[in-house]
Amino acid sequence: MCIRDRHAIVAGARRAHEENGIPVVLVGRPDEIGDTGGLPVIEASEVIAMDADPGSSVRTMKDSSLVRAAEAVRDANASAMVSAGNTGATMASALLRTGRIKGVSRPAIATPIPGPTGTPTVLLDAGANAECKSDWMVQFAQMGAIFARARFGVATPRIGLLSIGEEAGKGSPLVKETWKLLDEVDWASLGADFIGNVEGRDLMGPEVDVAVTDGFTGNVALKTLEGCARNIVGALLEAFETTEETKAAAEQLYPALLPLYKRFDADSYGGAMLLGTKGPCIISHGSSGEDAMANAISVASEMVELDVVGQIHTAING
């Protein structure tokens, strides 16, 4: 557990431990962490800044909290890693210290995209690999299907390839080549189904469970959806504050809107998962609060219990 906003993160860690019985180890400077509520601490004297270069920071700051957390997983002193710090450095630490699962070409970030049905769409890659190869994206699909089943209970994950049209012949050369490879996979043996191309409008709909794309496109799509959601919520709040009548209407609608808000609230999902490394790694948003951190730790614990790493190893290597 890496420390950034120590108050929210420590509170979330303590809650995950106290309410769910999850053993948590904090990593950082003890004097800055504060009251841990009895949780153990792995001391780390350095902190990788949010704007630091990921690769060079991980290589040179060997006593940073991110590196120490990844080493704890590598050395079996922890089962998983959760961080709300520098995303690139988190990925680099997990990759360089714990290593890739045998047979996995590149790890990918799997991010839940909430939708109206209550079961999110898993989008990957959401930013780990700006440039991809078609065979990497086939592995993303395999890992995403395993994650969707383990995390959200999707019995037969429907895998879609994000493109500019549903027809098989549409898309960039990378998308077209990936489509051919995905169509050749025996998805039934993995308990999944390839449904072909999907479009951006399908990401929040009920038609697809796993949406596969390269990290550049996936990150742009994710940030676009986040921006749209933030602006829509802001516009609604502004509209409700217009008159006394709209304020009264808002109070009446609150019980119905609250469950909808929670369904689309990123904090309820805890964060994204880096799939493909030997140790489970949850990447939370830098602004994560107590709820998000507690949920992220719960997700990490669940992924360990369900042996998602082992399932991916079996799927990739047969």
Located regions from the model:
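Glycine-rich phosphate/nucleotide-binding loop
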Residues: A8, L95-T119, L123, E207-A211, ...
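Phosphate/nucleotide-donor binding subsite
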Residues: G37-A78
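Short glycine-rich anion-binding loops that position phosphate/pyrophosphate groups of nucleotides
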Residues: E46-V47, N86-A89, L96, E166-E167, ...
